[in-house]
Amino acid sequence: AKGEIVRTHIMRPTWHYVAGKDLRWMLQLTSSRLKKVIDSWVKASGLDISENQYTQCNDLIGKMLSGGNCLTREEIEMELGHAGVPVTGDRVRRYVLRAEMEGIVCSGADKNGKPGYALLDEQVAPASSLPREEALARLAVNYFRSHSPATLKDFVWWSGLTVTEAQQAIGSIKELLVEEHFEGQAFWVFAACRKTENRDLIQLLPPFDEYLVSY
């Protein structure tokens, strides 16, 4: 309820839990790329959603959620339908995804077991924007500090960045990383977390464990 942790689509088109204070600068890094992914989905599904429709929906969603309101996607669909907006097929999901990409909405309180949406600016405290280079560096620090050892490919998959962007991010924090090679691959280890002593206990996590996959 305080917006300290929010659920949204931010690095890849899947749910992520994000610290509210980090949400805006992360959106600055990823939203344009994510919008292209969503647009390709729309085209592949045969839907025709224009930029004007997205703008109209963003405005309507902003109005219906203003004042601390929280609505489920089904409730948003009903309101959009009443306003004369096409809601057939998978359109409403795309409208809401775009509103997330634009930084208009994020998760609000769940309602009857279904995810609710609230206005980002009402749910999350204001935060300063970051220069792109600083945002890339911060994302890399957050990743390698919690996921080391990891490869460039790992970072690209997790972050949704391009290879060039990921390389730039790693390069900007190289003084914080140690490069190790194993079976022909370069792994980056966050130096402050590096341990050289042997461990008697090894803990394994399953694929797609939320701690590793989500942020």
Task: Name each model-derived stretch.
Residues A1-Y215:
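Long, low-complexity intrinsically disordered regions
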